[in-house]
Curated annotation (Swiss-Prot):
Organism: Arabidopsis thaliana (Mouse-ear cress)
Keywords: Acetylation, Chloroplast, Plastid, Transit peptide
GO annotation, cellular component aspect: chloroplast; chloroplast stroma; chloroplast thylakoid; cytosol; plastoglobule; thylakoid
Localization: Plastid, Chloroplast, Plastoglobule
Name the record gives this protein: Probable plastid-lipid-associated protein 13, chloroplastic
PANTHER family: PLASTID-LIPID-ASSOCIATED PROTEIN 4, CHLOROPLASTIC-RELATED
Gene name linked to the record: PAP13
Family of this protein: Belongs to the PAP/fibrillin family.
One Pfam short name: PAP_fibrillin
Interval spanned by the transit peptide: 1-48
Length: 299
């Protein structure tokens, strides 16, 4: 078995060592990746690739993996340079920025390391929306908010989605008057229709009860909010319980859509709808999550 061990510490060159055996090879490399997402933190990542190839084919796999990592970091940088989520939903991204992001999306999609993403364990988890195409439902919903209300009155700060056990829960975080926070939650059911294709059926929409940030409330509104709070306390218990649990809207049988997963790894998810419009999502890490990415290639 041929063993290739490449170490890339910081700015040093890649070092490869080959054994003389011509049997199927194990390909292992340690790659410190500079995370260029929104946190801008530098972390060390270990990447292991198991390759059933001869010694002559292994460097090609190494080169392809380096190309994929480079394309991924390039996309994250392009998203940041385009102004991020806020610039996208407010329509502040330029045509040049949009075409640049779309070009990098296409470059990364062709290097997709997951052949059957719809059934991959990597698909499940909590994802943050980073990019919508011009016809995306998420972008249309966001622009409705900004067109109806100026940014000083309403602000969509973040959109995320939790995918687990063939169910999805998308959450939009909204802030009103910079002092009242609320969430719009859209629940849906996912049905696998192929290695790349899924059907999403919307089940329920919910508007959570707003939370007031008292220290951020403008002086001219404190009296009105105080009166509203007093009025709510005087409502019957049944109505108060209903308001506390949020306003729920049944959606079963009303809306559905089809989409395909064009790229999936441990950090990035790219989907396209029936019009080919891309959405880019990045995984939301928890404090206990690891920084180890394991990818296997079989040939």
């Amino acid at each position: 078995m041929a063993l290739i061990h490449g170490s890339v510490p910081g700015t040093s060159a890649v070092r490869l060592v080959f054994s003389t055996s011509a049997s199927p090879s194990r390909f292992c490399l340690n790659v410190p990746v500079v995370k260029q997402g929104w946190k801008n933190s530098c972390r060390r990542r270990v990447l292991r690739a198991m390759v059933q190839e001869t010694v002559q084919g292994s460097p090609l796999v190494y080169a392809r993996e380096m190309e994929r990592l480079s394309a991924k970091e390039s996309l994250l940088l392009a998203l940041k340079d385009a102004g991020g989520f806020e610039a996208l939903v407010t329509g502040k991204t330029t045509n040049m920025q949009r075409i640049d992001v779309n070009e990098r999306i296409t470059s990364l999609e062709r290097l997709n390391p997951t052949p059957r993403p719809t059934t991959s364990p990597c698909f499940e988890g909590r994802w943050n929306f980073e990019w919508f195409g011009s016809g995306s439902p998420g972008l249309l919903a966001a622009r409705v908010i900004f067109e109806r209300f100026p940014s000083t009155l309403a602000n969509l700060s973040r959109m995320e989605i939790l995918i687990k056990d063939a169910n999805a829960k998308a959450t939009a975080n909204i802030k009103l008057l910079n002092s009242i926070e609320s969430k719009i939650i859209l629940s849906s059911k996912l049905t696998v229709e192929g290695p790349l294709r899924l059907k999403e059926e919307y089940v329920e929409g919910m508007l959570e009860t707003p939370t007031v940030i008292e220290e951020a409330v403008p002086e001219q509104l404190k009296s009105a909010l105080g009166q509203a709070a007093t009025t709510l306390q005087q409502l019957p218990a049944l109505i108060k319980d209903t308001l506390a649990s949020g306003l729920r809207i049944p959606l079963s049988g009303s809306f559905e859509r089809f989409f395909m997963i064009s790229y999936l790894d441990e950090e990035i998810l790219i989907v396209r709808d029936t019009e080919g419009v891309p959405e880019v999502l990045t995984r939301i890490e928890t404090p206990s999550s690891t920084v180890v990415e394991t990818i296997e290639y079989d040939s």
